[in-house]
């Protein structure tokens, strides 16, 4: 049997502490399905009901896991629980797509309340975690590293919480949130989604928010990427914007990434706004991001690849030092962008510090 079901009341979740997760919150579940090394996480998920927890003990699990059950929690044992690609290609749709964990709903019925916690996902050709058509998704204490494209990818989703994760050495973004991962269209209202407390390093770009609205990115650390944070929009409507980028540490994102069909070379980019509106960048510490790309510098405003301008954005009360070619760079022709109260030395054009 792939898992053992333990019927229990919520109060008995103290048993989680016995497997080294004393700091985890109480299990809000009707049942716990325990998965040990050599067993299948997917089999446990397939047996689970809404409200259940799949508790995965230490070990390496060579599989992809597809979740369609609402209000399900998958909880590992920290970095000792590792999900890697299956030895034999194929399997479910998640495996066929090159993903580690998929949380998949539909446009008519988003899958709600799924939590993924305290595990590592590594080595997949595309994304460690791929979420589509979800509501109130929670991903926390996850290590997503050495994946071909994104560490954590969330599209067509509302009210997600991505917190206290580590995303390292992924081929594209460490954390990616978008209206669509492929395709265009107007910006999605994320309904106050949150990306917070994450450590994002050695990716192409640390955090990408593409064609979304009403998202907060705060208290994250981005270092060693080609670029720290990219907020991306275009001329489509609704326009991307109404984001808050605050209280982040964006340090020495000086890895070199070659140009592609949409973007020039990326190196030394701290926080980049391209084609967005009414976004606030405040109280961040942005230091030592240096390069010679048009996107290089501490905080950079740059037109979108389709020419869509930035407009109505506020850059205030940031510490931006030792960035190059400038700490603050306004390379846009959009209207209503303001720079106030920033601690910096060099701006382009002059007068922004």
Give residue ranges: language-model regions.
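Secretory targeting and sorting signals
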Residues: 1-29
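Extracellular beta-strand/beta-solenoid scaffold signature
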Residues: 88-107, 123-130, 146-155, 169-190, ...
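Parallel beta-helix/beta-solenoid
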Residues: 49, 69-70, 78, 111, ...
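Acidic Gly/Asp/Thr-rich repetitive segments characteristic of extracellular carbohydrate-active
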Residues: 31-60
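Leucine-rich solenoid repeat scaffolds
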Residues: 307-353
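Right-handed parallel beta-helix/beta-spiral solenoid domain characteristic of secreted/periplasmic
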Residues: 30, 34-39, 71-124
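Extracellular beta-strand solenoid repeats
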Residues: 55, 66, 75, 84, ...
């Amino acid at each position: 049997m792939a898992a053992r079901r333990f019927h229990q009341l919520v109060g008995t979740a103290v048993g989680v502490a016995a497997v080294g997760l004393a700091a985890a919150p109480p299990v809000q579940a009707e049942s716990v399905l325990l998965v040990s090394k050599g067993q299948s996480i997917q089999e446990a998920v397939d047996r689970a009901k809404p409200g259940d927890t799949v508790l995965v003990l230490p070990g390496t699990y060579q599989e992809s896991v597809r979740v369609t059950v609402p209000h399900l929690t998958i909880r590992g044992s920290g970095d000792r629980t590792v999900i890697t690609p299956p030895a034999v290609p194929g399997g479910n749709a998640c495996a066929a797509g090159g993903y580690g964990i998929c949380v998949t709903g539909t446009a008519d019925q988003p899958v709600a309340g799924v939590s993924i916690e305290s595990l590592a996902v590594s080595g997949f050709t595309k994304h460690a975690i791929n979420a589509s058509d979800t509501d109130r998704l929670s991903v926390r204490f996850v290590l997503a590293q050495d994946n071909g494209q994104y560490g954590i990818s969330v599209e067509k989703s509302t009210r997600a919480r991505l917190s206290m994760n580590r995303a390292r050495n992924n081929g594209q973004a460490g954390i990616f949130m978008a209206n669509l991962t492929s395709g265009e269209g107007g910006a999605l209202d994320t309904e106050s989604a949150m990306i917070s407390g994450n450590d994002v390093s050695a990716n192409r770009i640390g955090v990408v928010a593409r064609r979304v609205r009403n998202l907060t990115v705060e208290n994250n650390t981005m270092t060693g990427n080609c670029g720290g944070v990219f907020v991306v929009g275009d001329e489509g409507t609704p326009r991307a914007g109404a984001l808050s980028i605050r209280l982040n540490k964006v340090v020495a994102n000086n890895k070199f990434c070659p140009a592609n069909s949409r973007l020039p070379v990326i190196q030394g980019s701290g926080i980049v706004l391209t084609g967005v509106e009414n976004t606030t960048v405040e109280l961040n510490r942005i230091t030592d991001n240096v390069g010679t790309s048009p996107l290089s510098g501490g905080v950079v405003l740059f037109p979108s690849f389709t020419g869509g301008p930035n407009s109505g954005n506020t850059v205030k009360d940031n510490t931006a030092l030792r960035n190059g070619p400038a700490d603050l760079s306004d390379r846009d022709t959009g209207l209503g962008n303001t720079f106030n109260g920033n601690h910096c030395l060099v701006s382009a054009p002059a007068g922004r510090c």
